């Protein structure tokens, strides 16, 4: 009897000693692991902090949003500027060194040599089809011409906003505009656009679908036309297809890294007064027409004030933005 009790007590003692040893071993292992992990975290934290020279900014909403950054007070040292001008400008200036001269003048305003790019275009149509807005800031000089007010106004609406567009097959389908942002954009050497609104039975309202002469003309011999019709109503279209293309587009929002300077004209063309344009910061300006040298001098003198109403953007944009946005 006593032997059994001694054996039981001995087993308890052995179990207790064994359990104590196991717990001590586990404790040492855990301490080792914790110390190692803590050491690694401390080392990585030091390394990551040593390399963090950037500014943490929340990325929310549109990429056009203007954020204050470390270069804002350094005269845009890390930015690029594209200046677009009509081909008549270098012809009148007649100086092979004029771009170098302007680059040196921009340098006095804080824009390093090589950060300003000069881009020539021949006419409004060419520029609207292929603008190549690749710089952080893009400023377009447009010479006011009597009779081209509508083309200039619609060019401004086109390049001051982003558009997502798709081709239209007007020979097979009827089309309707679904809201204020939905427009039809027509481009070409001579665009005449006619429409025939349809009722629920696809019969013409005030027009005959089989006779384009009865259609309503909404654009006549224009290079660029942004067509706005009654929303939620099907329309049959007739367009001068040999000299013109038309696309179904949705306005996505302002392209805030673009500004337009109207050269000459008694009044500035204000697209913000257009009921189809959402209120926005004015990025259209006017300078008096004298000579092109005077125009460029004015731009250089006020370049930093002009850029302040714009928002820098890192994406490069070209004509694909208007048609097939990528």
Swiss-Prot record:
- Transmembrane ranges, per UniProt, are none
- The reply to whether DNA damage figures as a keyword in the UniProt entry is no
Keywords from UniProt, A to Z, are: Calcium, Capsid protein, Disulfide bond, Glycoprotein, Host endoplasmic reticulum, Host-virus interaction, Metal-binding, Outer capsid protein, Signal, T=13 icosahedral capsid protein, Virion
> Where in this protein does the record put region CNP motif?
165-167
User: What Pfam families does its record include?
Assistant: VP7
The subcellular localization recorded is: Virion; Host endoplasmic reticulum lumen
Which Cys pairs does UniProt list as disulfide-bonded?
82-135, 165-249, 191-244, 196-207
User: Which GO terms label this protein's molecular function in UniProt?
Assistant: metal ion binding
- Tell me how the protein is altered or processed after translation: N-glycosylated.
Whether Disulfide bond counts among this entry's keywords is yes
Extra information = Some rotavirus strains are neuraminidase-sensitive and require sialic acid to attach to the cell surface. Some rotavirus strains are integrin-dependent. Some rotavirus strains depend on ganglioside for their entry into the host cell. Hsp70 also seems to be involved in the entry of some strains.
What this protein is reported to do is described as: Calcium-binding protein that interacts with rotavirus cell receptors once the initial attachment by VP4 has been achieved. Rotavirus attachment and entry into the host cell probably involves multiple sequential contacts between the outer capsid proteins VP4 and VP7, and the cell receptors. Following entry into the host cell, low intracellular or intravesicular Ca(2+) concentration probably causes the calcium-stabilized VP7 trimers to dissociate from the virion. This step is probably necessary for the membrane-disrupting entry step and the release of VP4, which is locked onto the virion by VP7.
Q: How does it assemble?
A: Homotrimer; disulfide-linked. 2 Ca(2+) ions bound at each subunit interface in the trimer hold the trimer together. Interacts with the intermediate capsid protein VP6. Interacts with the outer capsid protein VP5*.
Q: What is this protein called?
A: Outer capsid glycoprotein VP7
* Organism name: Rotavirus A (strain RVA/Pig/United States/Gottfried/1983/G4P2B[6]) (RV-A)
């Amino acid at each position: 009897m006593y032997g059994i009790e001694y054996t039981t007590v001995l087993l308890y003692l052995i179990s207790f000693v064994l359990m104590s040893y196991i717990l001590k071993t586990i404790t040492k292992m855990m301490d080792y692991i914790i110390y190692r992990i803590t050491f690694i975290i401390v080392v990585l934290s030091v390394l990551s902090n040593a390399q963090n020279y950037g500014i943490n900014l929340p990325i929310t909403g549109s990429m056009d949003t203007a954020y204050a950054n470390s270069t804002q007070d350094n005269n845009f040292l890390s930015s690029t500027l594209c200046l677009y001008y009509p081909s008549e400008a270098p012809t009148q200036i007649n100086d092979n060194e004029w771009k170098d001269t302007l680059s040196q003048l921009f340098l006095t305003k804080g824009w390093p040599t090589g950060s300003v790019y000069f881009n020539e275009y021949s006419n409004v149509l060419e520029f609207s089809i292929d603008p190549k807005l690749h710089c952080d800031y893009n400023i377009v000089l447009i010479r006011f011409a009597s009779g081209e007010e509508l083309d200039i106004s619609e060019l401004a609406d086109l390049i001051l906003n982003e558009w997502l567009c798709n081709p239209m097959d007007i020979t097979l389908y009827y089309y309707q505009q679904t809201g204020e942002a939905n427009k039809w954009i027509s481009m070409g050497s001579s665009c005449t656009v006619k429409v025939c609104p349809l009722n629920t039975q696809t019969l013409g309202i005030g027009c005959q679908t089989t006779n384009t002469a009865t259609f309503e003309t909404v654009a006549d011999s224009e290079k660029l036309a942004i067509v706005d019709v009654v929303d939620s109503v099907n329309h049959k279209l007739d367009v001068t297809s040999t000299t013109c293309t038309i696309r179904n587009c949705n306005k996505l929002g302002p392209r805030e890294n673009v500004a337009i300077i109207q050269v000459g004209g008694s009044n500035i063309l204000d697209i913000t007064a257009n009921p189809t344009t959402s209120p926005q910061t004015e990025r259209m300006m006017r300078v008096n027409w004298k000579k092109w040298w005077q125009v460029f001098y004015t731009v250089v003198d006020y370049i930093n004030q002009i850029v302040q109403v714009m928002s820098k953007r890192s994406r490069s944009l070209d004509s694909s933005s208007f048609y097939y946005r990528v």
